[in-house]
Amino acid sequence: MSSVFTVKIVGPAGAGIKSGGLLLSRILLSHGQHLIDYSEYPSLVRGGHNTYQVSFSHQPVSSIHYQLSLLISLEPNHWQLHKTELTKKSLVFGPDAPLVLPLSDLVKPIGGHIYANTVALGVIAYCFGFDPSICHSEIINTFSLDSPNLTAFDAGFQYAQNNFIQYQDIFKIHSNAPVKRALIVDGSEAFGHGFLVGGGNFYAAYPMTPSTGLLHFLAQKQLTHPITVLHPEDEISSASLAVGAAFAGARAAVGTSGGGFALMNETVSFCGVANLGVVFYLASRPGPATGLPTWTAQGDLLHAVFSGHGEFNKIVLTPGTHAESYQAAIEALNLAARFDVPVIVLTDKLLAESSASFTPPTYIPKVVSSPRHLPGSDDSFYMANSYEHDQNGFSIEDASLVKKVVTARLSLSKKIVKYLPKPVFYGSDQAKTLILTWGSTKMAVLEALNMLDNPSKIGLLHFPSLWPINPNWALMFKPFKNILVIENNATSQLSTLLASAFPFKPTSTLLNCDGRPIYPEQIVKYLKPYVS
């Protein structure tokens, strides 16, 4: 198993923790490291306690880790909140930390506390043996050739050299050549790249954490891509605009989080009856109501699957990694176009806002389209009617005709199942215990399996789509003695969903409902009885 290092920067909001962390990630990428990051922040503009952490290795790393290699606090009274994450080997720097770092004194001649985050990067670079010239290049690319951040970085590096010489290169990284074409993207940006490659040309959204990043990303792309991005007055308007765009022939999507998606439910139903393919990007956060606006959870699975009133076809995709988020955007657009149904891409704050090293595929994906009755066409006629209707859109109420139309509509689900991404198995054929996951929890489980001394006893089955359910999935569980479900909610919604389709009862579940991710260290501990 390769060494995975985790660095965490903490302090108050407004201290540039996220921007400093992303600069650190770019430095890591330039040293050939694979990485994934995670940030926490309260729902405050200033104040509170913010964090940024990044786990990295010279080999692929799937998830952030809980235990820290190095922790830097930009102000007093912050590092103490993370004592449970420290080990005997952890280094802790800060104004009041075990390894005193007088940031206020170091930044005074540079221009103030705004540069404390870059001073901290200098200390990190010293401890990991980063190439200062590479660090300088990344700082220049991020800011400018004459940026005070260069002076700030050197001040941190020099202070560490003078005061922490015993920690020089204490963490031995394997520097690789930078991965060609590699990017640092969060889950929403990965989805956005896939959306553009897949021919998406209309996006509407009202800002709502944690989906807002996709709105910002695609809005910027209007300058270079044939896409229209709108920010209307609320979520209902956003969904309605996307539906109108789809009716006019666009490959359209709309984005939101749980409370916003609740407002869009009538539109989901309208898409289902009017045969309009729209993609809904649903980035979950803890609920109910406002819940925990800036934290993470997987509590909206059943909400997505059973969204809308009445009975109609819909598709729910559940990507688990940045690469899957990219692919899910392409698949969602194609499925919406092929079957003219609403497609919900369900992610969460952890995946949507965490960045990772990612290399976009070089292939050009196939763009699937279906015959459309476009408004204004001389050779076709169709009404997108919210009433039950016949094939031309005319309202109907005759009992026999209604039954025929409803039966024909719902029968499409058998065909849809054949086009959905299939469950993916990871592990040995000798495994007797099977873990089931969906969404971002896959990342932590994969990392945990890599940390086990005897991983051959454990297999992982990940579901990149969860609706419609293929009843044949039940056959995949038969070879295993133990079935474990791991997900980031309180009630094991995956278990409930599977049990609605066929007899299903897991051996055990590992659940989390505190707004934080499930970490691989938790999973390793949970799996001990099954690998001993």
Where are the regions that the model predicts?
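Thiamine diphosphate
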Residues: 1-15, 22, 32, 141-306, ...
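Anionic-ligand anchoring segments at beta-strand to alpha-helix junctions in alpha/beta enzyme folds, i.e.
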Residues: 2-67, 198-233, 436-443, 448-452, ...
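Conserved thiamine diphosphate
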Residues: 71-73, 122, 295-342, 531
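ADP-ribose/adenylate-binding Rossmann-like module
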Residues: 82-99
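Short alpha-helices
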Residues: 96-141, 489, 493
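Cofactor-/ligand-binding subdomain signature composed of acidic, glycine-rich
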Residues: 115-121, 132-173, 369-396
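Flexible, low-complexity linker and terminal segments
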Residues: 177, 184-198, 328, 333-532
